[in-house]
Amino acid sequence: MMQGDVSPNPSLIDRTIKMRKETETRKVVLAWGLLNVSMAGMIYTEMTGKLISTYYNVTYWPLWYIELALASLFSLNALFDFWRYFKYTVAPTSLVVSPGQQALLGLKQAVVQTTPPRDLAATQISPSPPSPSIQGQSVLSYSPSRSPSTSPKFATSCMTGYSPQLQGLSSGGLGSYSPGVTYSPVSGYNKLASFSLSPSSPYPTTVGPVESSGLRARYRSPPTVYNSPTDKEDYMTDLRTLDTFLRSEEEKQHRVKLGSPDSTSPSTSPTFWNYSRSVGDYAQTLKKFQYQLACRSQAPCANKDEADLISKQAAEEVWARVTMNRQLLDHMDSWTAKFRNWISETILVPLVQEIESVSTQMRRMGCPELQIGEASVTSLKQAALVRAPLIPTLNAIVQYLDLTPNQEYLFERIKELSQGGCMSSFRWNRGGDFKGRKWDTDLPTDSAIIMHVFCTYLDSRLPPHPKYPDGKTFTSQHFVQTPNKPDVTNENVFCIYQSAVNPPHYELIYQRHVYNLPKGRNNMFHTLLMFLYIIKTKESGMLGRVNLGLSGVNILWIFGE
């Protein structure tokens, strides 16, 4: 096997592009050089005349050093630009092309050297011993207008499975190759094929090498000696045709690469000849990429999407009764996130901190049995009455804990919900695990806990009312829980109604209208958001005598401007 390691010369197109870039750069660097010389001259004139220092009455020596640095910089830039201009003018990149290539590439006569036209006639050259200078040269290097010195070389790695014996190269003509190219049989190929010339035709139609399954020659013409110009239609006369041809060839090479199981095989390598294959040639490849049905999407996913769409449409219908601005509904997710964050930062986190502070004070006072989360609500209420002067915040904390007899679970769940900043552990229809056992209906849901602490917080912000001596002003007026029912016929009723406990579901009653938002994980938050939105838009931000805006509770900021 021949060893060939000859690196190809830069392509003609690359050198053409380089030459064009040099031509364009030569104009630009000349302009920049003149500009830099002008700037340096102006600064030098100012240095000798001291115009700026005299006009502005400033110290001359610091200014002189600054001007010297700028003049030096512009001078160096000018020298560099003139050096580049001189380089591109005196020693430009030159090309040796034929007149046809010059017209095709759009080159000027002054920058190229053209080869003289030749009178060509198709001749057949007798075989000669292999020339060492072209060992490893493939038939792909043939071109009617390419000299042997500029023909690309192909290493033997590109011809795996073949042993080409090139029979000679004519020294008398340009690009004239010997037709005596034979191939020796290798595994998988049981037929010797050789090129033969047809002296009567400039385009021989003899079968090329290796006419076997999986390898069909696109260009069946063997390399011949041309001594007459080819037809006009065989030349590309403009850049557009050249670009179209190159693009089509690149696409074909890309398709062959994708369809070839082994790029190193001579019958499947993306080279010059393996195009125009038949369907049978791709049989092995098509077996690897058999048509397969895609997996069906699961029905629950489709049902879930459909349910979400129906839920969204139902929510839009309910909100349309409150506001005509449908664009506000696009901000519902943002409002919900802000509201959850407000509950966490304003209620839950301070509540947990105060509970831990009170528990610490209880231990210091010698009352470890009154630890919050361990003692009953009744015991804590009695302690709040007895020790009110010592622990004034205990009575307010007890109001938040008056939800379930299981104080340990309630305190631990409030701590879990306060973590993460946005109640990430919130479960709308259940709660958390408690002491290794799953949540059950004997424990309050997270929705019930959040609703309770929200109502209790607003109880603490509203002024006392003589009608509600227990201090639950907001809860008594604006929250109704089943089995109790609100008086829908009363126009003054404005409340949140919990119509179901497990799973929890909330409705809004306002001016004899029932606003029933869709069931699900956001039902409680969206109901509370509608409650607050009505207060902002229809009640001027006032809940009774308390402002829920910036000067009061400061909760309406979640809706933006």
Curated annotation (Swiss-Prot):
Chain positions carrying an annotated carbohydrate: N57, N274
What residues bear Phosphoserine in this entry?
S11, S98, S201, S248, S278
What InterPro entries does this protein's entry cite? Cytochrome_B561-rel (IPR019176)
- The segments labelled Disordered in the record are 120-156, 200-232, 250-270
The UniProt entry's GO CC annotations, sorted and at most eight, read: Golgi apparatus; membrane; nuclear envelope
Question: Which intervals carry biased composition (Low complexity)?
Answer: 138-152, 260-270
Its transmembrane ranges are: 28-48, 60-80
Enumerate the subcellular locations listed in this protein's record, separating them with semicolons. Answer: Membrane; Nucleus envelope; Golgi apparatus; Cytoplasm
Q: Which UniProt keywords apply?
A: Cytoplasm, Glycoprotein, Golgi apparatus, Membrane, Nucleus, Phosphoprotein, Transmembrane, Transmembrane helix
Q: How does it sit in the membrane?
A: Multi-pass membrane protein
What does the protein in this record do? Nuclear envelope protein which in association with NUP205, may be involved in nuclear transport of various nuclear proteins in addition to MYC.
- Quaternary structure per UniProt? Interacts with NUP205.
Listed name of the protein:
Transmembrane protein 209
Q: Which organism is it from?
A: Mus musculus (Mouse)
What gene name does this entry carry? Tmem209
